[in-house]
Amino acid sequence: MISYIKGELAEILPDVIVVEANGIGYNIYVPGSVPGELPSVGSEVKIYTYMNVKEDECSLFGFLTRDDLSMFKMLICVNGIGPKAALGALSNITADDLRFAVLADDVAAIKALPGIGPKTAQKIIIELKDKLKLDEVFESALSKNKKADNNSNVSNVMMIRNDAVEALVSLGYSSKDALVAVKEVEDIENKDSETVLKEALKKLVKF
């Protein structure tokens, strides 16, 4: 099994890249977001891969991080989700956002992904929820935030959400209710953690 391929980026197409290593060009299917995050052709890249073997075909699916690859592997373990469907899903949602959606029983967010209907969305939640732990999801998200630009608005919003959910869980609310309540708070980017927490608490009282 190939864990990753490190070599020269030879070609970039919308959903496929070619990486040359030791004189061999590897055709690798990637999420739609990956081409825009890659360096220029000719640069060295490291792509974490999954090899899908069929009777008449052998395909490589690649990701920029082990975390994304891990989420991909979890998705294809769900009955009815193949590599192409999993790749399509991760082209439209980050691994962290998908985890939060699963923990929050957010069927609407998951069924909005291409190729995923209501029944499949429910199946994803049922089959993956027991494999995810809230503290590990937060740790992963916060770790990525620390690596991001401290002035990044997206990073700041994620940290505020995480702080609010953690506070609600510490107050005795379930992770599902906490996630749903915080998600419903509007205009988070213009609010601090305390304000978001107060508004989320008001929503929980109405539940």
From Swiss-Prot:
GO terms for cellular component: cytoplasm; Holliday junction helicase complex; Holliday junction resolvase complex. Residues 144-155 are annotated as: Flexible linker. It comes from the Bacteria. InterPro entries: DNA_helicase_Holl-junc_RuvA_I (IPR013849), Hlx-hairpin-Hlx_DNA-bd_motif (IPR003583), NA-bd_OB-fold (IPR012340), RuvA (IPR000085), RuvA_2-like (IPR010994), RuvA_C (IPR011114), RuvA_C_sf (IPR036267). The keyword DNA damage applies. Its main location: cytoplasm. It holds the Pfam family RuvA_N. Residues 65-143 are annotated as: Domain II. Keywords: Cytoplasm, DNA damage, DNA recombination, DNA repair, DNA-binding. Residues 1-64 are annotated as: Domain I. One of its GO terms (molecular function) is four-way junction DNA binding. It is found in: Cytoplasm. One of its GO terms (biological process) is DNA repair. Residues 156-207 are annotated as: Domain III. HAMAP family: DNA_HJ_migration_RuvA. Belongs to the RuvA family. Has three domains with a flexible linker between the domains II and III and assumes an 'L' shape. Domain III is highly mobile and contacts RuvB. The RuvA-RuvB-RuvC complex processes Holliday junction (HJ) DNA during genetic recombination and DNA repair, while the RuvA-RuvB complex plays an important role in the rescue of blocked DNA replication forks via replication fork reversal (RFR). RuvA specifically binds to HJ cruciform DNA, conferring on it an open structure. The RuvB hexamer acts as an ATP-dependent pump, pulling dsDNA into and through the RuvAB complex. HJ branch migration allows RuvC to scan DNA until it finds its consensus sequence, where it cleaves and resolves the cruciform DNA. Homotetramer. Forms an RuvA(8)-RuvB(12)-Holliday junction (HJ) complex. HJ DNA is sandwiched between 2 RuvA tetramers; dsDNA enters through RuvA and exits via RuvB. An RuvB hexamer assembles on each DNA strand where it exits the tetramer. Each RuvB hexamer is contacted by two RuvA subunits (via domain III) on 2 adjacent RuvB subunits; this complex drives branch migration. In the full resolvosome a probable DNA-RuvA(4)-RuvB(12)-RuvC(2) complex forms which resolves the HJ. NCBIfam families: ruvA. This is Holliday junction branch migration complex subunit RuvA. It comes from Lachnospira eligens (strain ATCC 27750 / DSM 3376 / VPI C15-48 / C15-B4). The gene is ruvA.
